[in-house]
Structures are given as structure tokens and as C-alpha cells.
Regions:
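Long extracytoplasmic/lumenal interhelical loops at the membrane interface
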Residues: 55, 301, 308-377, 396-401
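Transmembrane alpha-helices of multi-pass inner-membrane enzymes
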Residues: 72-75, 412-421, 426-470
Length: 487
């Protein structure tokens, strides 16, 4: 029996009547809905902090996990339209989840940890959002990644303006409100508050602008302008202005890693080295021009004061920067005697556990991510979970490196933040967790650049190819093809 779906698959796409082009298949309809759910996840990631701080502060606590039911819905929809991958990384995640559930039961029955709610929140922190890394590339095409990049560059402009206003405002201003009425945003130097933008904390703004830097550099390095020129230039100004204003070493170092990745790309693709050099010179010139303005000099002075104070407090740059990063890998080994065989309780190292058990936001176990995981779950499962994250990061990094050697830039730029986050990110903070999985998924989706480049090369010239993304036949056929491999 012939159905619309069988006709669509049987007839070459270019010969389909218009009525079939306008009516996606049943599977395609679910895939489109799935893509919209992922977009909703992105928008909540950007604006959930604004909801918690300004719009509905009375619901700040439940909004902390507002993306949790959404990510479950994404998984159910992915299963429904056969976009939930069953591969090595996903099976590894499932086996670890089973192990952690069994460990949580042992801890609860032996009186270790904070009880059922704390253990459930710990399992949610470690595993609920992690599979999204592998679902996104099954749904997002390279065109979708560029669309999202355009929105990130658009958002970077008002986000910078908001952070400048927060920088200039007092700690008690409504613009610098925190997600709890009894706390304030952190002051970083000379009475200035570390601005958080629309996010609940400054780390969210840091992740956002590292992502914006990757898309901005990618756009500048292309032979053809993929975004409007005004947008790219405005994003460049925004990214540079926010560096000293942020007061965040994570933001500055993260953007620096993207620039380092750009330099490395030019070194392994000598044919594009001249273009890459031009991008770096342009960034340097704009930065130099900004340094002549009074506001930028003031913000830079405040940031350097914060940098020097933090370095001095930690024993110098070596202790404050280098050891803070690499020391986190050795800390869990020194804490093994405290962890014991089964750990101190899954979820005990999260902010939610400290709020439930003490009523305050304190580190009950450790501040570092590796130490938190090992102290919560003990050495066996703790190091297994950390090794899994390192393995996923290594897989993403190797594939991005292979893409870079073929002259494909975007996945390579995204990988620098994705891999760092997978290895070291403090995922007990929901915004950090959201950016870790989302950037990782975007990086894997960006590996499909070859197909997109071939399609653009075969189409008539356009000033901004991104304007037509998702409108051609490839965007409709995307959901009927095989999922992108991720392992």
C-alpha cells in the first residue's frame, strides 16, 4: 500500500510536486518538534537566570531545574523519531548510571550521605543532561549550528550593554540582584560587582562569551561573509569590551583559548594562514583602539587589580592560575583517605545539598570538580565517571583535530571550550552543566561542515548564505537520512 511517506522516499527529491514538499513525513514532523525543543533548551539556558533574579524571584528554587523536564521530553521525542543514539558513549553513560544508582542505594541503607533527595539530585547532576551531547548532533545540521551562532552573536550585543550597566551599578542595585534575597553578586575589585548578564552567576556569562568568541572568529575567518557585516563587527566590539568588564578570569582565559586555537589552525592550514593572521591583526587593532577610551582603561585597571589580588592571595600566578587548573587533577588523590570505599554520599558536593542540609550555599565536600566526584562516590565509581568524561572529551578533541586538518574551523574552535568543560567543569552548578552539554553537542554537530560547504558552493552566490539556511532541500531530507555518527 502506497503512503505519502513511501512516495516521498521513492521519487527523487528534486522531482517531488510542491504539495509533497510542504507536507513533511510523520517522522519528519517529530524531528522538527525535537529540534524546536532543543532550541527551547538553549533559550532557557540563556534566560533562566533572568527569570530567577528579576521576573519571578519567588520561584527561584524550582526554576533551578527548569530544564530538567525539558531534557526528559527531548529524550522521549528523540526515541520517538529514532534520533536517540545507541553507541559506545551512550552505553558507557548508562552503565555508569546503573553503578551510581546501586551505590546510592548502598549509601542510603548504611546511613551515608544526605538521604534520598540529595542522592537523587546528585544522580540528576551527573547523568540527566549528559546524553544531550550525543542527541544534538542527531538533530542539528551544520546549518542549524550556524543559525544558533547567529543568535549568539545577536545576543552578545545587548548582553554586553547589560553587563556594562551592571559593572557601573552598585552591589545593591536591582540590576545586580542574585537568585536569593539573602545574598549578593560577588564584588571583584575596587567596589565593582562581577556582572552576570542574564545569568544567575558570572560563570554563565563567561561560557556565553567564549561561545560568542568562537562564532565571531569563525565568521571573520571565512572567505564569504556568512553573517551580516554589521553583526560580526558589533559582536567583535562586544566580545572585546566585555573582557575587562566581566572581572572573570574564566571568561578571559576561555576566549584566549579560542584565539590560541585560531593560531594553531593557521599553523596547520598554511593556505589559510594569511586570513587567520588578518583576523588576529584586526582583533589587536580594535582592542588597541578601545584601550584609548576612558571607560575601557578604567575597566582594565579594575580587572588587573582583581587579577593581581587573586594571584597574590594564591601565592602568585603559578599558584593562582597554573596550580588552580592542574592541581584539581591531583586533589582527589590526596583526599582518598577521607572518601573511603563508598564515598560520603552522592549529591553531597552540590550546592543544592548544602542548601537542603545547612540552609546556606557552602562547599560541604570540596570546591574542585574532581575532588567532589571522588568524595561523593568513592574511588572506584568516582574515577570511572571522571575517566568517562575525559574519554568523551578526547573523542571530541580528536575528531575536531581531524576536522581542522581538513581546513574546517568551527568544530575546532568549539572543541577548545567543549573539551575543557568536559574534563574540569563544576557541573553541580546548573548553568555550567547546561553549557557543557550544549557546546559539546554543537561541536559534534559542526563536524558535518563538509556537506554544508559543498551545498553552498553549488548554490548561486549570496552575500549572507546563513540567511537561507534550512530552506533548501537538504534541510528537509536531513531527518530521513542516517544520523550523524558520534563515536
Amino acid at each position: 500500500m502506497l503512503t505519502q511517506g513511501s512516495i516521498v522516499e521513492a521519487i527523487p527529491h528534486a522531482q517531488l510536486p510542491l504539495r509533497y514538499e510542504a507536507l513533511p513525513s510523520f517522522e519528519g514532523q517529530h524531528a522538527i518538534a525535537l529540534r524546536r525543543l532543543i532550541w527551547l533548551y538553549f533559550w532557557l539556558l540563556i534566560f533562566e537566570g533572568a527569570l530567577r533574579k528579576w521576573i519571578v524571584p519567588s520561584l527561584s528554587t524550582p526554576l533551578l531545574v527548569v530544564r530538567d523536564p525539558l531534557v526528559i521530553l527531548i529524550y522521549l521525542q528523540a526515541l520517538r523519531c529514532r534520533r536517540f543514539p545507541i553507541n559506545g558513549p551512550m552505553l558507557g553513560c548508562f552503565l555508569l548510571l546503573v553503578g551510581f544508582i546501586l551505590l546510592a542505594l548502598v549509601q542510603i541503607t548504611t546511613g551515608v550521605g544526605g538521604g534520598v533527595l540529595v542522592a537523587a539530585y546528585g544522580l540528576r547532576t551527573n547523568f540527566l543532561h549528559l546524553p544531550l551531547i550525543f542527541v544534538i548532533p542527531q538533530v542539528f545540521s551544520y546549518a542549524d549550528v550556524l543559525k544558533l551562532g547567529k543568535w549568539i552573536l545577536i545576543l552578545a550585543i545587548p548582553m554586553t550593554a547589560l553587563m556594562v550597566l551592571q559593572f557601573e551599578s552598585s552591589a545593591g542595585s536591582w540590576m545586580n540582584a542574585a537568585t536569593r534575597s539573602d545574598v549578593q553578586q560577588i564584588e571583584f575589585a575596587m567596589g565593582k560587582v562581577r556582572p552576570s548578564g542574564t545569568f544567575s552567576f558570572a560563570t554563565g556569562a563567561a561560557h556565553f562569551f567564549v561561545l560568542a568568541t568562537a562564532f565571531m572568529v569563525y565568521a571573520l575567518a571565512q572567505k564569504r561573509m556568512i553573517y551580516p557585516r554589521w553583526l560580526v563587527w558589533s559582536a567583535l566590539l562586544s566580545v572585546l569590551i566585555v573582557q575587562p568588564v566581566s572581572g572573570s578570569r574564566l571568561l578571559v582565559l576561555g576566549c584566549g583559548l579560542v584565539v590560541a586555537g585560531t593560531i594553531a589552525f593557521g599553523m596547520i592550514n598554511l593556505g589559510r594562514a594569511q586570513k587567520i593572521l588578518g583576523v588576529l591583526v584586526l582583533i589587536g587593532l580594535v582592542f588597541g583602539a578601545l584601550s584609548f577610551t576612558g571607560f575601557f582603561r578604567e575597566a582594565s585597571d579594575v580587572f588587573m587589580t582583581r587579577w593581581n589580588d587573586a594571584s597574590d592571595a594564591a601565592g602568585g600566578v603559578q599558584q593562582g592560575i597554573v596550580w588552580r587548573f592542574f592541581g584539581g587533577f591531583f586533589e582527589p588523590f590526596t583526599l582518598l583517605p577521607q572518601a573511603g570505599l563508598i564515598g560520603k554520599g552522592i549529591g553531597m558536593g552540590t550546592n543544592a545539598a548544602s542548601a537542603m542540609m545547612t540552609g546556606a550555599l557552602v562547599f560541604l565536600l570540596a570546591e574542585g570538580e574532581w575532588a567532589r566526584v571522588v568524595l561523593e562516590a568513592g574511588p572506584l565509581l568516582g574515577f570511572s565517571f571522571l575517566f568517562y568524561r575525559v574519554w568523551v572529551a578526547g573523542t571530541v578533541g580528536v575528531r575536531a583535530w581531524s576536522s581542522a586538518k581538513q581546513g574546517k574551523l568551527l568544530a575546532w574552535l568549539l572543541a577548545w571550550d567543549a573539551c575543557r568543560s568536559l574534563v574540569t567543569e563544576q557541573i553541580s552548578q546548573p548553568t555550567n552543566l547546561g553549557f557543557m552539554v550544549f557546546v559539546g553537542g554543537l561541536c559534534l554537530a559542526a563536524l558535518a561542515e563538509d556537506r554544508f560547504s559543498n551545498r553552498i558552493a553549488s548554490e548561486p552566490s549570496s552575500r549572507h548564505p546563513v540567511h537561507n539556511l534550512g530552506k533548501g532541500p537538504d534541510s528537509r531530507r536531513r531527518f530521513r537520512g542516517s544520523p550523524l555518527p558520534v563515536s
